[in-house]
Regions:
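Phosphate-coordinating catalytic segments in nucleotide- and nucleic-acid-processing enzymes
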Residues: 47-174
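Pre-Walker A-like glycine/lysine-rich segment at the N-terminus of P-loop NTPase domains
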Residues: 1-47
Length: 174
């Protein structure tokens, strides 16, 4: 289980260390980095699913889309290296670092060789973030839109959920 997540130079996170529990609720004002916490994990997951994590980070699709390296890099970053460090609360720590400085216009950031401690592929596959049992709950911003159609959340084989119409009603309460 993921117990700590360090995010360095990613979006609004210059250097953040977050302790995670069995249930973690992220709250805060707009723009403080709540979404970026989830996006950090989803970027690692989607790069792994795309068989590209050992080479770098896919910034777009299928789980989330950030844009380019310039969109991902924190505007106050002292250098162009984006890092994510995952800890299990015991001894296992995985550090993933990516070179955003040389990929500002790219949607794929190459692995930063000098500052990463990538586990082997077998260890990655056994980790909850990269296993076939991975699940998460995401939120969409409806922005005050009125939704009168019915939808249904349907799981796909990769652990993500998709909306299917005509099953569940969503109502905007004024």
């Amino acid at each position: 289980m993921i117990r700590t997540l360090e995010i360095v130079n990613f979006k609004s996170h210059l250097a953040s260390k977050i302790r995670l529990g069995d249930l973690t609720v992220l709250t805060g004002v707009n723009g403080c980095g709540k979404t970026a916490v989830t996006q950090a994990l989803l970027l690692l997951r989607q790069s792994f699913v795309n068989n590209r994590l050992m080479a770098g980070l896919d910034l777009n699709r299928p789980l989330c889309s950030i844009g380019t390296g310039q969109d991902a890099l924190c505007r106050w970053a002292p250098n162009g290296i984006i890092s994510f460090v995952i800890g299990d609360g015991q001894d296992e720590i995985m550090k993933f670092s990516f070179d955003a400085e040389n990929g500002l216009d790219d949607s794929f950031l190459k692995k930063h060789e000098e500052d990463s401690s990538y586990p082997d592929s077998e260890t990655l596959t056994a980790h909850p973030l990269f296993s076939t049992g991975f699940q998460y709950i995401g939120a969409s911003r409806w922005g005050g839109a009125v939704c009168s159609r019915k939808i249904h959340l349907q799981s796909s084989n990769n652990g993500s959920c998709h909306y299917r119409r005509d099953r569940v009603s969503l109502w905007r309460i004024s």
